[in-house]
Amino acid sequence: MTSLHSSPLSLAGTPAASPLGYLSWTFGQGARDPYYIMVIIYIFFPYFSNTVVGDPVHGQTLIGYLNATAGIILALTAPFLGAIADKNGRRKPWIVATVIIMAIGACALWFIKPGGTGIGIYPALFILLIISVAFAISEVFHNAMLPGITPVNKLGFVSGLAFSLGNVGGVLLMLFVLLAFSLPGTIDWSFLPANALFGIDQASHEHDRIVGPIAAIWMLLFTMPVLLFTPDGKSSGTPAWNAAKEGVRDVIKTMGQLKHYSNIAIYLVGRMFFIDGMIGVMTFGGVYASGTFQWGTTTLLILGLVTSSSAMIGAFVGGKLDDLLGSIRTLQISIAMSSLVLVTLVSIEPDTILFLVPVSTQPVWSFPYFQSLSELMYFGTMQIFAMFLSPACRHPEP
């Protein structure tokens, strides 16, 4: 008979970790996601495309190549790395290594200056590529911890909390950058300092470049609860080199057997396109808007703050829909509706909406941001898009 005081089982069938253990796990995503939100979506990538490269179209092309290269590298290496980690048993060493790489790379973003001075354009792309690959590998090993530490009936809550912490961290850091570095000296509000803090020079785009070091500090700080309080898998005792050989051998064997398991093969291909599609959509959100509407850092920060808040609302509603409809149906609704809204987003230009309908470019209100009708429509549509996409982001497995 099972003891009334026995630990609840995890999805892996082993005793789950204590609440401190699995709740501390959520800080890993809270540490990691603000980098993605600030650097990739809203601030640094648009700065890189428009100001470092100096040509939004060419900049977007380079970012597209960057994402494609990172995707290829991950497609070729992630299965082997996962198998190696399974053979060795431990995930934390991988998380430590990738977080250190990301933090060093994020700090280096400070030296990527306008016009390709400082670190040049192509060395900068290489740094961003290394960070992107390390980010994804960190995500793989961090997520791999979840099934073995979380009670089965807490999986939805824990994954949703991790997603929310990531967005909360992004909102807090963007708000700090907005009030401390971007708005001072540009608008006469009594609660703002007269000049950007710490001598940040807006003319040199230091308020764009500072987001890398800020994200690095945040990442290092909030990864600590995972390392200190979340239990790692037990070491198998297999030497690293033997684990690598066995892991590679298992992956090759599994790939050879996929022809007998067509459903699994279809799932893996679908998952690859699903994840790559989400990454592409999120990456180009701020880059596309900044290039199309000539939005600066302050405007993008406001967009990011509101959109991240909308994403949290969508994630909360998505969790409720999970309970009512099931996760598969919720995921289907999320993907279908976000795809429809995405078509609306890309149909908006400064002087047209829905591809064909002409609109005036004149301001429709006195607020200094999002002044034209098309800008307001893009802003509003972005909120709807974030609400529909976020339930899919809560479920990395389709």
Predicted regions and their residues:
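Juxtamembrane intracellular "pre-TM" segments in multi-pass secondary transporters
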Residues: H5-L23, P231-V269
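Central cavity-lining transmembrane alpha-helices of secondary-active solute carriers
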Residues: I63-A83, I104, V171-M174, L305-V317
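Cytoplasmic membrane-interface "Motif A"-like loop-to-helix N-cap segments
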Residues: A85-I101, D323-S338
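Glycine-rich segments within core transmembrane alpha-helices of 12-TM secondary carriers
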Residues: S159-G185
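Short amphipathic helix-loop junctions that connect adjacent transmembrane helices
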Residues: I37-T61, G280-L303
